[in-house]
């Protein structure tokens, strides 16, 4: 409710781009509704109008650690492939609503955190009776699939859209020269960078 003051101060400092995130739950409170919540969309309409007044370009994150709780409880978050369709519907609403208003999009915040912070990043609660790695990599696959669909849909709606995602960068180094440490480092780096590889190459 203080965003107008914040944006005015932001403009006073001379910034030209503001990264902000749209709350999935504001647009689809449960996540599986047929129609979006108009009041939620109106809130962001007003935010973007305020940014335009100050000639500030919005850089919008579609999903930033913020999933409708119902989707987590009912479907297990991105462990379920059904989440891809829920995300597609949500992203499509945003791309259509803000065509010509938002030109820069991030599909997911720190997409590779799916393997590190599964509940926060993918709405996944690990089932102790199932293989943990399998659950994590299934969720990662579904998130990458959802992201790819968003890029496709976003460009179909507005070919001028620039769409990517946020990656939690970092490099692992071996503790010693021992082969086990070196191999562990390779594995850790692979787990992080394969998220970029898939999106750049289009395959695993």
Pin down the residues of each PLM region.
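Short, histidine-centered active-site or binding-site loop motifs used for metal coordination
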Residues: 24-26
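Non-catalytic scaffold segments within catalytic domains of secreted glycoside hydrolases
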Residues: 1-2, 7, 11-16, 28-204
